[in-house]
């Protein structure tokens, strides 16, 4: 009888320990997931910034990587990648470096085509067209091969100018992951074609699929903030071995000395 009571007590103790450990793990996971969401929300608050000149007066996260007196540089990047079945992958996008010290903005528009070389290995053929930004207008700084490209560049809009995530907290069934070894973190949501941001992308790009995209928010570095880390977002419409259609965007705040770029 005494042995039976001890056995029962032992089993109850083990179950209690399991419940406590499970509760601690669940609480820690929920807390980290909430922190990941909050980290992304801090970046998504920038959307929309319709006038890019406003970035001259915006300050992002600063750490010891910034030198005294450096106001920092914003890097904005938007690009659309389309690889239809049986065709080459083409990427069109733009990168701007918005220097808060000099209140000047330079960058480039690029067109990249992924083909195979004579040995069947992937080859990335990219052309860059230098631009500057004045009074929220994109201006090519070198002659362009045709008026169509000139118009395409001058009319280009970054996703941060029209994207809006005011309803991000209403997104359902988010898949949140965290890798402490890098560290890296992400959040993935299945969208529908009625989503505002999806409609805006379809309005601006000829997206050759009716399939609704997944929204993937990606980040690396310290969750509390770091000028070394990065955050980006991706709308993935199609992703497989034969076909790829996705849109990527990022807005980064970095020390000005880390923003050297090249255009050809």
Swiss-Prot record:
Its main location: membrane. It holds the Pfam family DUF576. The chain crosses the membrane at residues 7-27. It is a single-pass membrane protein. The keyword Membrane applies. InterPro entries: Csa, Csa_sf. This is Uncharacterized protein SAOUHSC_02783. It comes from Staphylococcus aureus (strain NCTC 8325 / PS 47).
């Amino acid at each position: 009888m005494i042995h039976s009571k001890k056995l029962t007590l032992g089993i109850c103790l083990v179950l209690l320990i399991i419940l406590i450990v499970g509760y601690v793990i669940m609480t820690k996971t929920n807390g980290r997931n909430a922190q990941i969401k909050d980290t992304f929300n801090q970046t998504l608050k920038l959307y929309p910034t319709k006038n890019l000149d406003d970035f001259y007066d915006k300050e992002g996260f600063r750490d010891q990587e910034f030198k005294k007196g450096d106001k920092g540089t914003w890097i904005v990047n938007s690009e659309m990648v389309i690889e239809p079945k049986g065709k080459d992958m083409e990427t069109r996008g733009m990168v701007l470096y918005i220097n808060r010290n000099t209140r000047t903005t330079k960058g480039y528009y690029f067109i990249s085509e992924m083909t195979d070389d004579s040995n069947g290995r992937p080859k990335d053929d990219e052309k860059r067209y230098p631009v500057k930004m004045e009074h929220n207008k994109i201006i090519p700084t070198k002659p362009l091969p045709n008026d169509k490209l000139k118009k395409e560049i001058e009319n280009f809009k970054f996703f941060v100018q029209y994207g809006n995530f005011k309803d991000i907290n209403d997104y359902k069934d988010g898949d949140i992951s965290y890798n402490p070894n890098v560290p890296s973190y992400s959040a993935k949501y299945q969208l529908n074609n009625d989503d505002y941001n999806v409609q805006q992308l379809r309005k601006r790009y000829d997206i050759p699929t009716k399939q609704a995209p997944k929204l993937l928010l990606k980040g690396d570095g310290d969750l509390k903030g770091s000028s070394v880390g990065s955050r980006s977002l991706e709308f993935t419409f199609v992703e497989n071995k034969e076909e790829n259609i996705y849109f990527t965007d990022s807005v980064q705040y970095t020390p000005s000395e880390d923003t050297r770029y090249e255009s050809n």
